[in-house]
From Swiss-Prot:
GO biological process terms, semicolon-separated: tRNA modification
Name assigned to this protein: tRNA(Ile)-lysidine synthase, chloroplastic
Catalytic activity line of the entry: cytidine(34) in tRNA(Ile2) + L-lysine + ATP = lysidine(34) in tRNA(Ile2) + AMP + diphosphate + H(+)
EC number of the protein: 6.3.4.19
UniProt domain comment: The N-terminal region contains the highly conserved SGGXDS motif, predicted to be a P-loop motif involved in ATP binding.
UniProt key word Transferase: no
Top-rank EC class of the record's enzyme: ligase
Role according to the record: Ligates lysine onto the cytidine present at position 34 of the AUA codon-specific tRNA(Ile) that contains the anticodon CAU, in an ATP-dependent manner. Cytidine is converted to lysidine, thus changing the amino acid specificity of the tRNA from methionine to isoleucine.
Organism: Chlorella vulgaris
InterPro entries in alphabetical order: Rossmann-like_a/b/a_fold, tRNA_Ile_lys_synt
Lineage top rank: taxon: Eukaryota
Length: 504
C-alpha cells in the first residue's frame, strides 16, 4: 500500500506540474509526438487524462470498466487506474475548473525506417488511438536518414509543417531530465556556444518553400505542379488603363455647410445631362520586376510562425518514469535503435553517464542541470546588456542623422571622446575638424562635413569602440547583434580584441 501511495503521489505531482503550465490552456488544441517509448506514452496518458476530465469523465469510466471486464485480468485494469487516482486529487480539479480546458488532442508519429519493429509500433499506436478516439497522423520519410542529426532536423520540419497546416502553436514532447542532460553533453562534445548550451533554446521553424500552381496538366507532367523553391521570371511590365470620370462643380451652399475635414470625392452618374461632364482620362504605370505569371504562389518564408514546445516531464528522471510504467503496466514498444552503439547519443546514454555515476556522483544529471541553469542566467544577462548597447548605438546614429539632414547652415558630427577613466561614451558637437582613424581597419577620415554614404563607417567605428570597452566573452555576441554584415568585415575577432590602444 505504501508503494502504491508513493507512486500515486508522484503521478499527481506530474499532473500538477503539467496543469500549472499556462501553455496548455492558452492553446486548446495540442499536438503530441509519440514514439512508442516510455516517455512519450506517459505524457500521452496524462494528456488523455486532462482531455477527458475537461469533457466528461463518465464516458471514459464506462469504457474502462467494459475493457477491464472483457480482459478479465487485474494487470490491464491496473494500467488505467491513474485516471481515477488523478480525479480524486482536489488540487488538479480546482486548477482545471478555474482555467480554460483542453478541447482536442492529436498524435503524430514519424517513421524513420530504421528497424522492422517500427511497423509494429505503427499498429500499436493505431490501436491506442482507436480506443481513445483520438486523431492520428503518420509521417513517412522520403529520404534516407543516415545520422541522428539529419533525423532530428527532419522531425522539426515535419512538426512545424503540421502545426502550420492545423494552425497550432504548441507541440507536446516526452523529454525528461535525462534527455536534456544527454543533449547538453552531446552539444558540449561538439564545441557548442553558450546559446545552444543553455536550457532555453528557440525552435527553428524554417522550412523549404513550395510553389502550388492550380492548373490542369496531363498526368505525365503533373509532377511539375509541385516543385520546391521554384524561381519565377521577373520582367518590367507597363499596364495601361482608361476610364470615364464625371465631375460636378460644388455649389456655394455646399461649400459653406461643409465640414473642415470633409473629403472631396468625384460624383458619378449613369445618366447624361447638362450638370455632368463626361471626360476620358488615360494613364499608365510601370511595374518594376513583377512576376510574369500570376498563378497562386504560397511560400512559407514570408510567414512567421512561432512554435512552443511543452515538456510535462522535464523535471523528472527516467528512473522514476520507468518505475511508474512498471507499476501501471503501460503498453510500450521497444525500439532496438535506442540500444545500437552506432549513434553517439546511445554511447552517452549507456556508457558515458553510467561510468560517471559509478565513479563520482549518483545525482550527476541534477548537478549538470543546475550548472546549465546558471549558464542560462549568465547568457540572458549578457544578451540584455547587448540590447542596451544596441539601443545606445541606434540613439547615436539617429541623432547624427537628424543633425546631418535638418541643419540648415552647417552639418555637425559626433566625435567619440576616449581617454576618460570611466570609459563613458556620449555625443559632443565640435566646430573643429576631427577625424577617426584605425590602423588595423584602415577607415578613411571622417570630417565635419560628411555625406550620407559615410554613415556605415560611423556605425562600424562605434561598434568597434563598444567592443574594445567590453570583455572578451561579450564581444562576439555584440558584433552579431549590432553589425548585420559582420561576416564580411576584413578583420577577425583577435584583431578586434586588440583595438583598445588603437583609438586616437
Amino acid at each position: 500500500m505504501k508503494k502504491d501511495s508513493t507512486i500515486i503521489s508522484t503521478c499527481n505531482e506530474f499532473s500538477l506540474s503539467s496543469v500549472k503550465t499556462k501553455r496548455v490552456y492558452k492553446n486548446n488544441h495540442l499536438l503530441c509526438s509519440v514514439s512508442g517509448g516510455q516517455d512519450s506514452i506517459v505524457s500521452f496518458f496524462f494528456l488523455v487524462n486532462f482531455l477527458y476530465l475537461s469533457k466528461n469523465f463518465k464516458l471514459i469510466k464506462s469504457k474502462l470498466s467494459s475493457f477491464s471486464v472483457a480482459s478479465k485480468s487485474a494487470e490491464k485494469k491496473r494500467c488505467f487506474d491513474c485516471f481515477f487516482s488523478l480525479k480524486k486529487n482536489k488540487k488538479i480539479n480546482a486548477l482545471i475548473n478555474k482555467e480554460k480546458k483542453l478541447s482536442r488532442l492529436d498524435l503524430v508519429f514519424c517513421q524513420h525506417f530504421w528497424q522492422t519493429q517500427n511497423f509494429f509500433c505503427v499498429e500499436f499506436l493505431f490501436q491506442l488511438t482507436f480506443f481513445f478516439d483520438i486523431p492520428y497522423t503518420f509521417v513517412l520519410s522520403k529520404n534516407i536518414l543516415v545520422s541522428e542529426n539529419r533525423a532530428r532536423g527532419w522531425r522539426k520540419k515535419t512538426f512545424s509543417r503540421l502545426l502550420k497546416i492545423q494552425k497550432l502553436s504548441t507541440i507536446v514532447t516526452g523529454q525528461t531530465k535525462t534527455d536534456t542532460a544527454e543533449k547538453s553533453i552531446t552539444n558540449l562534445l561538439r564545441g557548442t556556444s553558450p546559446k545552444s548550451f543553455s536550457l532555453i533554446t528557440k525552435a527553428n521553424s524554417k522550412t523549404t518553400s513550395s510553389f502550388f500552381c492550380f492548373r490542369l496538366f496531363r498526368p505525365k507532367t503533373f509532377y511539375l505542379t509541385l516543385t520546391g523553391n521554384k524561381r519565377e521570371r521577373k520582367v518590367n511590365r507597363r499596364i495601361s488603363f482608361s476610364f470615364y470620370r464625371t465631375q460636378k462643380k460644388d455649389s456655394k451652399k455646399l461649400r459653406e455647410t461643409r465640414a473642415p475635414f470633409f473629403i472631396e470625392m468625384a460624383s458619378f452618374s449613369a445618366f447624361f445631362g447638362n450638370t455632368f461632364q463626361k471626360k476620358k482620362s488615360s494613364n499608365s504605370f510601370l511595374l518594376y520586376k513583377t512576376r510574369l505569371s500570376f498563378s497562386f504562389c504560397f511560400s512559407g518564408e514570408t510567414r512567421e510562425h512561432s512554435i512552443n514546445s511543452l515538456k510535462p516531464l522535464q523535471n523528472r528522471n527516467r528512473y522514476h518514469i520507468s518505475k511508474l510504467v512498471k507499476f501501471y503496466k503501460f503498453p510500450l514498444t521497444i525500439d532496438a535503435t535506442n540500444f545500437s552503439l552506432n549513434f553517439s547519443r546511445n554511447k552517452i546514454r549507456h556508457l558515458f553517464i553510467p561510468f560517471i555515476r559509478f565513479l563520482f556522483k549518483l545525482k550527476f544529471e541534477t548537478l549538470l542541470l543546475n550548472f546549465l541553469y546558471l549558464v542560462n542566467l549568465e547568457h540572458e544577462q549578457i544578451e540584455n546588456e547587448n540590447l542596451e548597447l544596441k539601443r545606445v548605438l541606434n540613439f547615436l546614429r539617429i541623432n547624427y542623422l537628424k543633425k546631418n539632414f535638418f541643419s540648415s547652415n552647417r552639418r555637425s558630427f559626433f566625435v567619440i571622446q576616449t581617454g576618460h577613466k570611466n570609459n563613458n561614451v556620449f555625443p559632443t558637437k565640435k566646430k573643429e575638424k576631427r577625424w577617426f582613424y584605425c590602423n588595423e581597419i584602415g577607415i578613411s577620415k571622417i570630417r565635419k562635413q560628411c555625406k550620407i554614404h559615410e554613415d556605415p563607417i560611423l556605425e562600424t567605428s562605434l561598434v568597434i569602440y563598444f567592443t574594445s570597452v567590453l570583455t572578451t566573452s561579450r564581444k562576439y555576441s555584440l558584433l552579431q547583434n549590432l553589425l548585420y554584415n559582420y561576416r564580411e568585415i576584413e578583420i577577425n575577432f583577435r584583431q578586434i580584441s586588440k583595438l583598445e590602444n588603437s583609438f586616437w
